[in-house]
Amino acid sequence: MSQGQERFLNYSQLLSELVDGRGRTLNDTTVAFLYQLFPNDLFVKAFSLLETHNLFLYVWDSIDDVALNDGVQCSDAEIDETSNSVAGSRLPTEGHQCHSKRNSNDNDISRLANMLYDLETRSKTLHRIIVQSVDEEVSKKPIYVDVTAWFCSCNEYTKCFSGMLHNNGDEGYQGMFETYGNETDDNFAKVNSHTHVNSSKVICQHLLAAAILLQTSLKVLKYFTSVKQSVSLFSINNKDDWLKLHLNIVD
Ligand SMILES: [Zn+2]
């Protein structure tokens, strides 16, 4: 993979300051700065997704074989097979108002959020982010975001990505990536241990919203899922439900 250009701004650190130290209120100064940092009202749109109950985060949470085959250790999880499973009716389907608008209970949200930020479990915990299309978008199909691979299924991302590839050739490909001169704790748009995607060039509102949740800090994730409760966080511990979740998105 290309070395790309050097990166200086620690986005994870900066976006972590979206909320105060206790994670209870927004830091208005940081919010105002971030409005300016991202182009084309991207931060406004992403922030809107986080505040308007349109983003759903599903976490595979089971000692069942899918997790075990992937090496997941659900060490701190008291698995309860009877609760918090996502029923079929709450899974996204094209053209429907999908999902329950309520989260799991507070303890469960906290435990799931911890799994997504725990150094031992975060890279092994399967998760899926789905964004419900809003009215002004042409397609009513739910949008699938894979923040780990820095991928989004929306048209905005596809245009952005193909534009970089086709308009600039090899130079465009190299321009997609950034590296740090030194070791960094910046996880924002990170695709491997040495490489970050150039998030000023390859990004969309859904990826930015997802990265704010999963690539900043635990207090930010808990702010939107537990304090403000504007992002729904569900556990899935049933393979059929997990497959339905995929089948509804992948044609
Ligand atoms: Zn997108």
Swiss-Prot record:
Compartments, as annotated in UniProt: Nucleus
Annotated region Disordered: the residues are 83-105
Keyword DNA damage appears in the UniProt entry: yes
A GO cellular component annotated for this chain's UniProt record is: nucleus
Per the annotation, which location comes first and is thus the protein's main one? Answer: nucleus
Tell me, what is an example of a GO biological process annotation in this record?
Answer: DNA repair
Keyword Cell cycle appears in the UniProt entry: no
Which key words are in the record? DNA damage, DNA recombination, DNA repair, Nucleus
Q: What does this protein do?
A: Plays a role in a RAD51/RAD54-dependent homologous recombination repair (HRR) pathway to repair MMS-induced lesions during S-phase. Required for error-free repair of spontaneous and induced DNA lesions to protect the genome from mutation.
Spell out the family assignment given in the record's similarity comment: Belongs to the SHU2 family.
> What's the protein here called?
Suppressor of hydroxyurea sensitivity protein 2
Q: Which organism is it from?
A: Kluyveromyces lactis (strain ATCC 8585 / CBS 2359 / DSM 70799 / NBRC 1267 / NRRL Y-1140 / WM37) (Yeast)
